[in-house]
Amino acid sequence: MHFKKTLKKERQVKTMAKKKIGIIGGGISGAGLAYHLSLYEGEADVTVFEKDTIGGASTAKSAGTVCLFDDSLKNRYWDVRLYGFESYLKMEEEEEGSAGFDKTGTLVVATNEEVEKVIKTGIALAKAAGYTGEYITDKDRIKEILPDISTENILGAGYTEDDGYFDGTMISNTYMKKAQKNGVTVKTGVKVTDVKIVDNKVKGLTTDDGAEYEFDVVVDCTGPWSKITGEMVGLNVPIWHTKAEAFFLCPPGKKLDYTFPVLKYPEFYALRAGDNIFICKSHLSMDLNNPMHAGQWDPDKLPATGGTDDYFIDFLLDQLDAKVPGIVDSGLVSSWLSYRAEPKDFWPVLGKTPVEGYMLSTGFGGNGVIEVPAATRDLAKLIMRDESTPLLENWAFERLLED
């Protein structure tokens, strides 16, 4: 009798309908979610819709820094940082170059006691996880790591040689290849034009080729486009655009004779990009009330290169003059503008919305490469098991609703 009941239960599981999930957006958020959903073998029927190419748009313009300790992610989310970092290291172990890892190390400068405290806590967490890290107050030692830095007006610096930066486009494509291998359908060059809602519940979506699809769940992974995407279901997604204006400098002498680490100050960051140096104003230093920093713009009108403002290059050159004077005379090689999707509290928006079956995985701002692995892992669990996690609760849509 027990054997018959077991067989009956197994048949029921085999014949159980798969949950049909549509993902809008093939950047790092959509790719990460597709991969984590694909791990629910035989339970999810997943289709990704990307209007252009996988890992393009804002993902392609990401700096890709995943530092073991800095101010981009509070230490309370250390597990999120570590999961992302080790996910990409695993990719690299499986296939060298699949995450685009450049192991330059990171130097995080302490400009005051509050920053110093954050750095020291981060170093302790990194060392507890088996990585190297040291807090340096010897100014000569700091200049050994970064000869062009000014050590005036700083307390010290945290340093590790274990991390560096990754490539968001490579990561996205690696995630998507893994997802496809597990049965996920990926449609590129296909734009979603409408999401079908009946009685405040998702029923499916329509694409620009006139095709209609039925889904139980639709997830918006469109980043800077989320406000536009949300309008399809009558949802006001509360995000702003902040300008990510990146500049590529050619150092004096054309090529540095040392490895330029990822350099982090509260106001800006820099890293090597081939023989050049990439610099950008930090996303946490952006003012959502400053129209030069933030607003609501059309991401479709972004140029592939250029589009930057004199305001930002002047700001960054002033920062270099005071803090890294050895490279301030660099030549400007190129620049680009991207829009970050930022909620008012600078944390992502994950999970359920007031529209049943319509979920969000957006608002990662400047931290997408860091946060996406843990965020989409937990979101996949919510979609497939209806189980929440502390991370999903902290980054839920409802926190942003006005009182």
How would you describe each model-predicted region?
Residues D318-D403:
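C-terminal catalytic lobe of FAD-dependent flavoproteins
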Residues G64-I145, E267-Y269:
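Dinucleotide-binding Rossmann-like beta1-alpha1 core, especially the glycine-rich loop
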Residues S38-A60:
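Glycine-rich FAD pyrophosphate-binding loop
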Residues A17-K19, D208-V217:
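Core beta-strand elements of the Rossmann-like FAD/NAD(P) dinucleotide-binding domain
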Residues Y35-L39, G64-V66, G97-F101, G105, ...:
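Active-site substrate-recognition segment that forms the wall
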Residues D79-L82, V109-V118, Y159-K177, T305-F312:
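Short beta-strand to alpha-helix junction loop
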Residues Y159-D209, Y213:
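Helical element adjacent to the flavin cofactor pocket in flavoenzyme catalytic cores
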Residues A17-S29, T47:
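Beta1/beta-strand and adjacent pyrophosphate-binding region of the FAD-binding site
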